[in-house]
Amino acid sequence: MKFSLLLLSLVGLGNAIELPKPNGPYSVAVRTSAMIDKHRIDPYDPRRGHRNVLASIFWPVPSPSCSKTTLPYMTPAVAKLYGQKAQSMGLSNETFAAFEYSVCTPLHTPKGCGSKRQFPLIIFSPGAGNSRLLYSNMARSFASFGNIVALIDHPYDADIIEFPDGKTIMTGNIPETTKSLIKLTKVRAEDISFVISEVLQSSLYKSVLKGLPGSVDKSKIVALGHSLGGASAAVAILSDKRICGGMDMDGQIFDPALSQGLEKPFFLVGRPNHSKEDATWNKFFANLRGSKKMITIDRTVHGSFTDYPQLIQALNLPASASKAIQPLIGTVNPSDLENGLSKIVVSFVKACSNI
């Protein structure tokens, strides 16, 4: 393809591509935490070790308290794997290694009212097979509007997880049968609850979260997710009373949440005709007994609910190349989509906190 040469010239020579900053009033700090659940054996680990979860925690910080820092969008091993996927589409294999985004390095911990501020906690579960890093821009946007966001990597589900010490866990090639996915959503739901417990631990504030202002508002803990992540959020709500509600972005719902429904608030947000193409949505929606909404976002497809639209926009591709990628990301304006999803999340958190 002709645009392959263009991409090679853009990112093949080490040119960084910085993603635009989000529109919320807060700057955002990010920390990474490897969390070992010593009370669970990982059912997908061939060595039967403890469940080992990795999370990126995005934290709102008042802008005057910040110094700008630029971070790689993906860690090296993850960028390499996704670069191979990009190459199969005619893009440079250095594409994902070139992306970066700005975050806040707190200059000092606010005192007085700022130190006592509490923020809602959003736990975000990715789509099946996806790295948590593929939602980093989205998480940063949510956090910029005053939410703490924890992005989870689910071991042996994500294509690859790269831990801070360089250790990697590759996909376990989990079958996509209904029985297997029901099991996986349960394991993922347990991951969600475990991460909530870890983020609420005072010890984390003395280590990974040290120097960040405010704390978690325990009355405003919500679970969100894309695709299988949304289904996992629904299952987590059934068993974890700390979660006040949840949201599914364009994902099929599985039992037991599908049949039992939920008492708590839940939003379904998806592409046009999702409810016609996926029978679980209408069934689940009918079984929701709390505040509920089914929201359609025009000109989106399943892949729109990741960072792909914003990443492709940042590449500034020729019109012909952008058109070729539209079936994967939709035709919605990426900036409008990012802002729209953030507004939906903010309204959902308010609905959740009113219960």
Locate the predicted segments by residue:
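Fungal secretory targeting signals
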Residues: 1-16
